[in-house]
C-alpha cells in the first residue's frame, strides 16, 4: 500500500510519507513550460493540463501524494465574485468593500461552477492511479479575500466586519455552504483526502476563534467523509483546540516545535513542518532540521511536509534530497 494512504488511514507505514504544499508550482521548469502565458483560470479550464501539472511532482520528486492543482479562490466565481490573478495574489473585484450588500451574489451550485476540477480529478485517478489530495480554503481565509478584496493584512478588515457588521453572518453562511459543496464535488470525483488551507486563522485570538468561527468549522468538517488534514499558520495558541476538531491530521507551520505539537494534539496525526526558506537556501541544514522534526514528531501518525508552501526560488534538487532523506530515515 502507498505510504501516504497507509499513514492517513491507519497511522502507520513502513516509510514516512512526504509531499509538499505548492509542490506543483513556479520552482518547477515543467510547470512553467506547461503554464506558458496561461492564467490560473485558463489552466483550470483544461482538465488534462490540471491532471498533468498535478502529477509532475510525483514523477520528478518521488513524493507519496499529489494535490490537485487549483486555487482556493476559484470556486468563488460560482457565487458571482469576479477574480483577477495579479502578481501579489488573487483580487476579488466585487468583494465586500465595493459590494457590501452582496448584489448578484448567490449560493454555490455545481451548474454555475465552470472550472474543470471534477473532470481533472477523474482523469488523474484513471490515468495515474496514485493518491490525490483535494483541497479548499478555510472559512476565515476565504472570507478574508472577499471582505478585503485580496490578502487582508493581520485580518484587520475581516475582524472589523466580524465584530461590527450585521451582514457578516450572511457572508459566513454563503462561504460555509460553498466550501462544503466544493469539497463534496472533489470527494465524489475520487480524491483520497482533503486538506483545508486556513492560512490566516492564526490572526484570531483564541476567544474569537471559539466564539465566532469554531462552530462553523465543525459544520464543514461534519460533511466530509474522507480523511482530513487541517493546515493553519500562527495557531500554536489554539493547536490543542484544533486537535479537538473532527480531523485526522493537524498540519503545523515551522514556528511550532514538533515535540510540543505532538504533546498538544492528543491522538491526532501531525503533518509538517520544515521552514520553506530553509528548504530553499541551505540543503545541509534542511536535512538536519528534517531529522530533528521527524525525531520530535515520531514515526506513527506523521506525514512530512513543509510548514507552508514551496517558494519559487527552491532548487528542485533540494526537494529531491529531502524526499530521499525522509524515505530512508532510520531504514
Curated annotation (Swiss-Prot):
Pathway, per record: Porphyrin-containing compound metabolism; protoporphyrin-IX biosynthesis; coproporphyrinogen-III from 5-aminolevulinate: step 4/4
Gene Ontology cellular component list: cytosol
GO biological process: protoporphyrinogen IX biosynthetic process
UniProt xrefs under InterPro entries: UROD/MetE-like_sf, Uroporphyrinogen_deCO2ase_HemE, Uroporphyrinogen_deCOase
PROSITE patterns: UROD_1
Chain residues that bind substrate: 22-26, 71, 145, 199, 308
Principal location class: cytoplasm
EC identifiers of the protein: 4.1.1.37
Swiss-Prot/TrEMBL site (Transition state stabilizer) positions: 71
Coiled-coil regions listed: none
Gene Ontology molecular function: uroporphyrinogen decarboxylase activity
UniProt-annotated location(s): Cytoplasm
Pfam families: URO-D
Tagged with keyword Lyase: yes
Record keywords: Cytoplasm, Decarboxylase, Lyase, Porphyrin biosynthesis
Alphabetized HAMAP family for the sequence: URO_D
Function: Catalyzes the decarboxylation of four acetate groups of uroporphyrinogen-III to yield coproporphyrinogen-III.
Similarity field: Belongs to the uroporphyrinogen decarboxylase family.
The protein's name: Uroporphyrinogen decarboxylase
